[in-house]
């Protein structure tokens, strides 16, 4: 009968409950064996892949994300800033115009109220 690694681990867990230290020792012995086992080969491949992912792929992904963010957000805002900066000085004039219109509306409302009051009193 051929036993796989997972079958061995399951057997160890079932036969030796509450012996996590011994299980850790056996797993460490299997994985760090000086003889090239499938488990040690797989572990080595995982470590190599992790190094490649962190050192190469993650940097490329960050660069791609930075470029995408810059093209979608920063560049349009800079364009709008350059386009509308000349109009920024006009906001003070607009504020003054709005204040004058507001004042005129209040005067008209007061005049209307006075006219209405005079009509009702006659």
Curated annotation (Swiss-Prot):
Keywords: Endosome, Phosphoprotein, Transport. The modification Phosphoserine is found at residue 33. GO terms for cellular component: endosome. Its main location: other. It comes from the Eukaryota. It is found in: Endosome. Belongs to the BLOC1S1 family. Component of the biogenesis of lysosome-related organelles complex-1 (BLOC-1) composed of at least BLI1, BLS1, CNL1, KXD1, SNN1 and VAB2. Component of the biogenesis of lysosome-related organelles complex-1 (BLOC-1), a complex involved in endosomal cargo sorting. This is Biogenesis of lysosome-related organelles complex 1 subunit BLS1. It comes from Saccharomyces cerevisiae (strain YJM789). The lineage of its organism: Eukaryota, Fungi, Dikarya, Ascomycota, Saccharomycotina. The gene is BLS1.
């Amino acid at each position: 009968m051929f036993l796989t690694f997972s079958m061995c681990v399951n057997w160890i867990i079932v036969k030796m409950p509450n012996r996590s230290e011994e299980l850790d020792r056996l797993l460490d012995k299997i994985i760090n064996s000086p003889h090239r086992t499938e488990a040690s080969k797989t572990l080595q491949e995982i470590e190599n892949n992790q190094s490649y992912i962190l050192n190469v792929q993650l940097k490329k992904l960050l660069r791609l994300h930075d470029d995408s963010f810059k093209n979608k957000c920063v560049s349009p805002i800079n364009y709008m800033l350059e386009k509308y900066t000349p109009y920024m000085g006009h906001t003070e004039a607009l504020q003054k115009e709005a204040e004058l219109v507001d004042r005129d509306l209040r005067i008209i409302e007061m005049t209307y109220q006075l006219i209405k009051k005079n009509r009702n009193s006659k």
